[in-house]
Amino acid sequence: MDFDLSKEHAAIQSEARRFAVREIIPRIKEEKFKRDLVATMGEIGFFGCAFPMKYGGTEMGFLGHSIVCEEISRADSGLRSLFNLQGMTVPYTIMEWGTDAAKEKYIEDLV
């Protein structure tokens, strides 16, 4: 069994690690909510890892989401919690059990 990351997953790991080192760690002592970092994470596509492209996702699956979660948590566990909640709770629930109209209306804006 091959446990190596795919090229795509290795790339998202590298991007998430770079983001954590360059953007999160230098600001960790601010001890306040970093709304701009959350916006940047959305722009990069981190929140859409587990979602199909038709909803604005990147189709990296749960493994991609977990990889980003791990890299963010190395820098700031609080931001990791926000990432995990924003990226999986409401949008994933709508994707799995929502109506087609709800999916079209909400998911892309949430991820």
Segments the model singles out, each with a brief description of its role:
Residues I24-V111:
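Glycine-rich flavin
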Residues I12, A16, Q86-T89:
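Generic hydrophobic secondary-structure packing signal
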Residues E8, E15, E23, E70-E71:
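Acidic-residue sensor for enzyme active/binding pockets
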Residues M1-I12:
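Intrinsic disorder at enzyme termini
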